[in-house]
Amino acid sequence: MSKRITIEELQSYLWNSAVLLRTNIDAGAYKQYIFPLLFFKRICDVYDEETAKAVEEYGDDASEFDEDEIHTFIVPKGYHWNDVRAVSENVGVAIVEAFRKVENANSDKLQGIFGDGAWTNKNRLPDRLLKDLLEHFSTKTLSIANCPEDELGQGYEYLIKKFADDSGHTAQEFYTNRTVVHLMTEMLNPESGESIYDPTCGSAGMLISAIAYLKEQGKEWRNVAVYGQEINALTSAIGKMNLFLHGVKDLSLIHISEPTRPL
């Protein structure tokens, strides 16, 4: 049974996950841990939702389909959110293993997306703290029915801004004031079928704004080629997650990379 999550509930849920880290992690590093866990939770909840829909529609025949015919992202057996949640010792190791397995199972889309946070450093992230984080995120089901893409994307953007506000001078590498971004988007006036390129895309705010602009205009946005370039690997991963959470899934249209020269 679905239970819609309001924007207010979502924002509180997301920010309270960061509050759990405050005594152990510097504010500038929140994004290394909260964003990957949020994305992993979303992937697994949507995976379960897609499985249930396939069984409802096809019954026993659902097992005849290849996983990629049913699922947006594949979650390998034994590496689902619930499997990680069940671990009581060496939780950081279990998280890293699940991240790598999911990345490898979706290598054309997700390679490197979970970053390289120090999950196994028990001085910074003891098992107790990681268990608390997992239990906190487990209090809500982040299915599409409960939290549509645009709304979860809005929550993600809220968290990006909160992290930027908390981390001060370190924020400029991944966050641009959204008022400026929206003004630039209106000046750009993107159209359906065009290519949109941001050479310093950060967390992909400009690219997301361009897609949102087309949606608000009632124009087709799925045929827009979106390109971004970002030299910082962590920020690039945040940008990829941002695009995915906003419903931009076709990675043949998305190129967030870290080259030293323009695309």
Task: Give the residues covered by each predicted segment.
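Conserved S-adenosyl-L-methionine
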Residues: 170-257, 261
